[in-house]
Amino acid sequence: MHLCNNQLLDHLDCNAVYRGYVSQENKVKRRKRLFNAIRKLWNERRRYRMPKDESISPTPISYSFRSLRRGHTSGHASEHTSSSRSSHDESDSMSSSSESDSDSVSSESNPKSYSDSSTSSARSSSTSGSISLYDDYYPAYSSNAPNTAISNYVSSGLSYYGNSSIIMNAVEYNQFFPLTITTLIVKNNKNVVSNLPKNVSFYFHSDNTVLLNEYYKSLSKLKNNFRGIIYKTTPYGSCNDTESLQVDTKGSVWFRDVSNMGSSGLIAFAPFDYCAPMHVLQAVQDRAKAILFYNASTASNSLTNFDHFEDAVDMITFETLPMALISYENGIAFEKILNEYSASSLNSVQDGGALVEYFGNIDATARLGVIISKEPKLLGLYIFIGVLLGLIGVIGLFICLHFSGAMNGFYRLLNRHGIPVQERIVNIGPNKPENRVTKEMLDTLPVRMFSGPHLANPNDELVYEKDWKLDKSESFDGQGNVVTTAERGSKYFDQRECTICLCEYSEESPLYRELPCHHIFHPACIDPYLLKNSDLCPLCKQSVTNMLENASEDNV
């Protein structure tokens, strides 16, 4: 039976789904087209749900993945992938190849070919005859991490349609999370849990764990990390799924074996099959911090199990209990490990001799501890961005402190000249218009004869320039007429040079004009500045106009 004749796929472009190749379209359009088709099929799943005894049953769609390096085949689908690739290269034989492959997929994945008593045959038939997606299917991913995740899931049992949708959703949004399982030593007398070095006993780490909460609802209310001791649950209400692919081992670590370790946290472990909602309910009653599922759904009931799980688990549980999903292959391995760690004696478990040698002959039990991290694989990028932003902040703070120190030095210079900082800020505000000194005001400013600097005695009392008084003597006005002159006593500061031209007062240029703030300049330097530029003193930035007006008011 051709895959395109299936009632579930009659509305899809079979070339896009089956071969992953349409010769006349570019890669981006092919990828979007395939994703949209699968989403449409998933949204209409309830419409096409059929009883198991119908003559036409939903055909499982399985996906294998080929690495970005052309010619590298992943998982157990190498044989089928190579045949699909040959059909991809030979356009003339594409139609006949697709028909023969689709017939093999339909016959091998038929629910009747599965046997409840033979799990291994079910696994082999579920992973064979998978539909190949070529290396141009995920060209947007430069990292091999999502590619490896798809390969691991497809080759280990998560290759049915319902499960593939979850994996593809995780690939599209990069929502794979790290899972770590280590050996813990629980001391019976103090009930203390201590971690072991991973080279001493059992250790497992995978970055390909999927959280079902992210697919069905939201992870916004969940914590970042979930830690606890793993134990196997029994489904609530004695639920039994006869089509489940789980393997019953002789022994395991049950809730009764870890019930006294609740303070360390508990992680439930269960197969994901039709009874998965009952396992969730039991985990809630056990007050577990999270539940770790491994896929145990067959091709015939995979879609039903995932629909049933979404309908049976309430929203509050989705938002409060983390539910992780790992592959069938890893789940069966953990089943066996739990069996080996079910012994109550430390030296009776796996690598017991090494544990006794490491810890000594102590009264303790070996258990498996689980750590599920919510942080995605981009955590390293987030850390790099955080460090970069922190470095930029430190550099910005250093620059601010540097300029702040420079401004403080400038303010100290103003204070040394007796100028209040607040007055200076108000006078040079950015919105304050510049005033100029008129010719009449300029003529009122005296021009004096510089009589030479006087050095101060270290024992003299310090007096600021604004406090000194003029001793009347010879001086000149703006027209060169002799008026009065003044000499500053040895106890007062003095200016030895004009701060505009930076030339010292000497016998060649002894004249200076004195502003009301007692700063002096050469008349040839200060007069054009006051008449054309501003009435602010070049040194203290005080307004000459305001100072003259205040002086006239004081005289009145």
Swiss-Prot record:
Gene3D superfamilies: Zinc/RING finger domain, C3HC4 (zinc finger) (3.30.40.10). Keywords: Cell membrane, Ligase, Membrane, Metal-binding, Transmembrane, Transmembrane helix, Vacuole, Zinc, Zinc-finger. It is found in: Vacuole membrane; Cell membrane. Residues 74-85, 93-129 have a biased composition (Low complexity). Its main location: membrane. Residues 69-129 are annotated as: Disordered. A zinc finger (RING-type) spans 498-541. One of its GO terms (cellular component) is fungal-type vacuole. InterPro entries: RING_finger_E3_ligase, Znf_RING, Znf_RING/FYVE/PHD. It comes from the Eukaryota. GO terms for biological process: ubiquitin-dependent protein catabolic process. SUPFAM superfamilies: RING/U-box (SSF57850). It is a single-pass membrane protein; Single-pass type I membrane protein. This is Uncharacterized RING finger membrane protein C15C4.06c.
